[in-house]
């Protein structure tokens, strides 16, 4: 992420260097990683955003709470007793839960894991009661009945799992989302005509039936 962003920021703005990236090198790394040498708002030319992947707050199938409201009530009744898994400090699974904590006034404790798979294993096993991975990462285990969705970060409910309320619904915050965006950027100063051409071609590819079907399949 950050290595690619540094290389892109230093490259010539000739249309031959473009970066496909998630949000982290631009929305997180400059504020949490020492040695980040680029300015996310000044050193790049945005081309187009191609996808937004929602996060989903989940609990194990055997959890003592079945809904977001029940979880929040338990957390408020027992401050500091509940914890939640994250895929590491500064990851979406960490920062989005911290936002929920602030909005709800919850005192729940982050437990950073080295990987999504490790966090998911402990969630299923009951060692940790909460986790907020990406929806595609959680979907197979939700379909298998091993975990339960409490709130999804998309603007609307998922067509695949329509019973899971949105984060906006459970928090009473219309328009609020918890997503990871993916898009293409180029070095600062890329000519407008090149940006327009790349935007057209990338958007055309992203709208192809095969790509749309693949994205719909994972939520």
Stretches found by the model and what they are:
Residues 10-17, 23, 31-118, 167-175, ...:
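Hinge/capping helix and adjacent helix->loop/strand transition within the periplasmic-binding protein
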Residues 45, 71, 146-158:
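Conserved helix-loop-beta element of the AMP-binding
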Residues 154, 212-219:
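Mature extracytoplasmic/periplasmic domains
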Residues 30, 159-161:
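Cytochrome P450 core scaffold surrounding the K-helix E-X-X-R motif
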Residues 15-21, 83, 129-133, 149-151:
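Paired acidic/hydrophobic, glycine-rich loop segments that form the ligand-binding mouth/hinge
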Residues 2-13, 75, 98-103, 117-127, ...:
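Short helices/loops that flank or line small-molecule/ion binding pockets
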Residues 24, 88, 136-137, 153-156, ...:
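Glycine-rich beta-alpha junction loops
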Residues 1-2, 18-28, 49-50, 131-139:
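Ligand-binding clamshell of periplasmic/extracellular solute-binding protein-like
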